[in-house]
Regions:
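Nucleic-acid endonuclease domains
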Residues: 1-81, 89-307
Length: 307
């Protein structure tokens, strides 16, 4: 039986000859068995990263190597000895996995994981739990599998979660939705579900995965996690709902206290656009310098400083 612990990433280095061998196997597997069906399927690179994560997990759990001829289902990658169906999820990036990251307002943002809604809502994809991983790769120009023996690749084992809890608590974002990444934003090109790392079940070691049984899955299905938003976005949304007359300052103070955030949060739009609007209101005679001075205490204009 599994014993809950807070998620803490487990790094597995995929370097030297041993790591290269695993990367070579992932490359060979995807080359021989590309997934060319299904809407919004993963790219060849994404399929390669997913295969590598599964190959690594199988190796460290003492399981047989990945084999397309005896894969039990499209919905999951392997069965645990307890009968639990596991799907390994992997996201690749050039940075190591961090549980929190700083933006340029020095306020931490919590890390998240991503799911495809079409998989989550397809009952034919029979799976009990997802094992969430993150693959640190070389630069985008040089990270094509299998890479080289000298390159540094690291797989982070982040934790696990039941499919049913992701369906219940994850936040669905339609294609084109905006999300924050580091010091900038991007829009999702595909439909997405965000689920935050802090809400995963942690693993002290990878072989602890073998202890998960149906009672653990049921307990996770019933578990109530925290917000699947960054604390910063929760405050931004609260500000917006106050402006729309739905919430009030009591809710803002509550969320700020719960998140332990006292700094001013940077807006999504440029602060220059805020000042432009305020100056227009002043020209219309609706505000005075007092409001502009107050805004200057909270927001900072961003002058052009050259390329």
């Amino acid at each position: 039986m599994y014993q809950y612990s807070k998620p803490k990433p487990i790094p597995i280095k995929l370097i030297d000859s041993a790591g290269f061998d695993l990367r070579q196997k992932a490359f060979q597997f995807v080359s021989a068995n590309p997934n060319t069906t299904g809407a919004e399927r993963g790219s060849e690179e994404q399929q390669g990263f997913g295969a590598l994560a599964e190959i690594v997990v199988r190796k460290y759990l003492g399981m047989p190597e990945i084999n397309p001829s005896n894969r039990p289902s499209l919905g999951y990658d392997f069965l645990l000895p307890t009968g639990i169906k596991v799907d390994v999820k992997c996201r690749g990036g050039t940075l190591p996995f961090k549980e929190e990251y700083l933006s340029n307002d020095d306020i931490p943002r919590e890390a998240k994981h991503n799911f495809w809604p079409r998989q989550m809502n397809d009952d034919r994809l029979d799976v009990d739990i997802y094992l969430m991983t993150h693959l640190k790769t070389p630069s985008k120009k040089t990270r094509k599998l299998p890479g080289t023996k000298r390159q540094k690749w690291i797989l982070y084992i982040c934790g696990w979660v039941s499919k049913e809890r992701v369906k219940r608590e994850g936040v669905y974002l339609p294609r084109g939705s905006l999300t924050e990444q580091g010091k900038t934003w991007f829009t999702y090109q595909k439909h997405d579900i965000e689920f935050y790392n802090k809400n995963l079940n942690g693993l002290q070691s990878l072989d602890e995965l073998l202890k998960i049984d149906q009672s653990d899955v049921n307990a996770d299905i019933a578990r109530k996690g925290d917000l699947n938003l960054t604390s910063v976005d929760a405050i931004r949304i609260t500000y917006d709902l106050i402006g729309r007359g739905i919430l009030n300052n009591k809710h803002l103070e509550y969320i700020k206290k719960k998140a332990n955030i006292t700094n001013e949060i940077k807006p999504i739009l440029s602060s220059n656009q805020y000042f432009h609007l305020l100056e227009w209101f002043k020209e219309e005679g609706l505000i005075t310098d007092k409001e502009l001075e107050r805004a200057a205490q909270i927001l900072k204009k961003e002058p052009y400083t050259g390329i």
